[in-house]
């Protein structure tokens, strides 16, 4: 109820659950906000992960989560949940921030999220909170290792941003027969320097999709990654997008150019250059349709209760509610679904709970 109604606090949940539909839903009195917060510290985190696992299997059987161009994609990325100068817990990370010329200790939590990406659906599968002295890569390894042990066939290719060209990650994936496709942007890396030296003046592949023209370079069998002893492939894409802007009473066109470089273990004989570029941009799904949606529309950018178990459990419950909500949207007739913004459907759910409460006032 907390997440499906997009409530901002346990206090709001307590008020909503005291009367009307909230009370009928619970069939008993709603606990106070303090009781809910205390109970969230002892929630069954493995049980919540098991619920997400059953949902993943059901979505697969119902052909909701399907492969993209013959491959199952997953994205892993880090996210900072919130920060504070005053409140902390034993699992908080710390950093020094200069405020008005004075250094202050800031406490914060970061987490790594694992998302499955399909052509028409995305599913947030798991969540790992960083320990006090962890970096994002260490937490990501724990998360990926747990996913591989629990759901060994849920993905073929793992996508990641510029923090994930790490030998330990590539080795783990290759040990399990998986491939990596991650952004390569550190100009100090010998791998990127060597790849740029091999990119010719003319692109090896050009194509167009919508308003964007792609010029691509593809180099295989690079072995200049000292800590990773297998050969890798580097793909570069220079993308020019034509944008239209309205100034005063007329439209003006301008071009915007961006460059992307990816390193991957995928062989060119199995996945062509254009598909690598397409898959590489799917990484943004976890930013645009994951974190942005959860923070801006689901109010996940703050602590409901500052406790590590509570944070993990509530985010896993958020993943469950997120999947249920988007499954509900898929079952609405397209003509009706497209006529209303997504947030309106969330407000309608809240109204379903509020109307009985108002009618009984």
Regions found by a protein language model. Give the residues of each.
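Gly/serine-rich nucleotide phosphate-binding loop at the start of the catalytic core
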Residues: 1-31
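Short, conserved catalytic/metal-binding motifs centered on acidic residues
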Residues: 13, 32, 36, 70-84, ...
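Active-site-proximal, Lys/Arg-enriched surface segment
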Residues: 37-119
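Electropositive, glycine- and tryptophan-enriched low-complexity nucleic-acid-binding patches
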Residues: 96-154
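Domain-level cores of phosphate- or acyl-group-handling catalytic modules
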Residues: 134-191
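An anionic, glycine-rich sequence signature occurring as long contiguous blocks
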Residues: 179-283
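A short, flexible helix-boundary coil/loop motif
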Residues: 208-215, 220-223, 295-361
């Amino acid at each position: 109820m907390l997440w499906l109604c997009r409530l901002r606090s346990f206090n709001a949940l307590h008020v909503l659950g005291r009367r009307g539909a909230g009370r009928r839903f619970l069939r008993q009195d709603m606990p106070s906000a303090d009781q809910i917060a205390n109970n969230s510290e002892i929630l069954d985190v493995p049980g919540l992960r098991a619920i997400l696992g059953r949902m993943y299997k059901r979505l697969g059987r119902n052909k909701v989560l399907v492969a993209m161009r013959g491959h199952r994609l997953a994205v892993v990325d880090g996210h900072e949940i919130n920060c504070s100068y005053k409140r902390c817990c034993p699992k908080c990370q710390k950093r020094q921030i200069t405020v008005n010329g004075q250094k202050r200790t800031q406490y914060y939590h970061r987490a790594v999220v694992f998302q499955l990406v399909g052509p028409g659906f995305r599913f947030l599968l798991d969540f790992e909170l960083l320990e006090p002295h962890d970096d994002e890569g260490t937490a990501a390894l724990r998360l990926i290792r747990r996913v591989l042990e629990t759901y060994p066939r849920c993905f073929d290719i793992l996508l990641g941003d510029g923090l994930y060209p790490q030998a330990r990650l590539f080795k783990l994936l290759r040990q399990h027969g998986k491939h990596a496709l991650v952004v390569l942007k550190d100009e100090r890396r010998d791998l990127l320097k060597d790849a740029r030296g091999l990119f010719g003046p003319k692109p090896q592949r050009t194509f167009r999709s919508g308003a964007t023209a792609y010029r691509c370079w593809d180099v295989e069998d690079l072995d200049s990654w000292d800590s990773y002893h297998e050969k890798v492939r580097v793909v570069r894409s220079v993308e020019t997008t034509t944008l239209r802007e309205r100034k005063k009473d007329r439209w003006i066109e301008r071009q915007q150019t961006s460059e992307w470089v990816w390193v991957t273990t995928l062989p060119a004989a199995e996945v062509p250059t254009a598909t690598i570029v397409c898959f590489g941009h799917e990484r943004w799904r976890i930013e645009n349709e994951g974190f942005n949606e959860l923070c801006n529309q689901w109010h996940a950018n703050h602590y409901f209760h500052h406790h590590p178990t509570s944070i993990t459990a509530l985010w896993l419950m958020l993943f469950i509610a997120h999947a249920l909500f988007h499954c509900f949207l898929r079952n609405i007739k397209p003509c009706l679904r497209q006529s209303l913004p997504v947030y309106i459907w969330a407000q309608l759910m809240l109204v379903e709970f509020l109307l009985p409460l108002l009618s009984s006032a």
